[in-house]
Design a protein with these regions (language model features):
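Single-residue recognition of alpha-helix boundary sites
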Residues: 21-23, 127
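Asp-based phosphoryl-transfer active-site loop
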Residues: 3-21
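Residue-level signal for pocket-adjacent positions within structured domains
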Residues: 10-11, 66, 135, 146
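Short, surface-exposed, low-complexity cationic segments
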Residues: 24-31
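C-terminal cap/substrate-recognition subdomain and adjoining C-terminal extension
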Residues: 2-5, 81-82, 87-152
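A metal-dependent, Asp-based hydrolase signature
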Residues: 20-21, 33-104
Length: 152
């Protein structure tokens, strides 16, 4: 019986230097997919986190709630377009150590698995870009044309 070896990496903060969801939210605002008011709603929480008055998890929780609210009824093609832009730009901003470990595991023919709480349409693109064999992420449900605002 042969055994396969797998290396499991969390994307947000372990491979990538930040949260894919946060970068996608910023780009959705920049591309007018989300209204600018999202930034204003999040700003007090971001400032509180940056001033160490709020835990990062609380800041990220607020950001993800706003993200889920504003992705509802958005066109999947618009969201995907912005997702591609995020991955094109941000996929190079990786921790060197983690990038080297992924490379080493690939050379050893180990399976590479990515996990993330970020949206599946971002994680799948990052996984493809970095050659992961399998990935798990938050699923943002849609009907093929528009996002429902439901996450599993």
């Amino acid at each position: 019986m042969s055994q396969e070896i797998a290396a499991i990496f969390d994307i947000d903060g372990t491979i990538f230097r930040d949260s894919l969801l946060l970068h996608h939210m910023e780009k959705c605002i920049a591309y007018d997919v989300f209204p600018i008011s999202v930034e204003m709603e999040l700003k007090p929480h971001k400032n509180a986190w940056q001033n160490r008055e709020l835990d990062y998890d609380d800041y990220l929780y607020t950001a993800s709630r706003l993200y889920t609210k504003y992705i509802s009824n958005k066109n999947t093609l618009d969201v995907e377009f912005v997702a591609k832009k995020v991955i094109e730009k941000e996929s190079k901003k990786l921790y060197r150590y983690t990038r080297d470990r992924i490379k080493w595991h690939k050379e050893q023919e180990h399976k590479i698995i990515f996990i993330s709480g970020s949206p599946d349409f971002l994680v799948s693109k990052m996984a493809e870009k970095l050659g992961a064999d399998l990935w798990f992420a938050s699923q943002y449900l849609n009907d093929g044309n528009k996002y429902s605002g439901e996450v599993i």
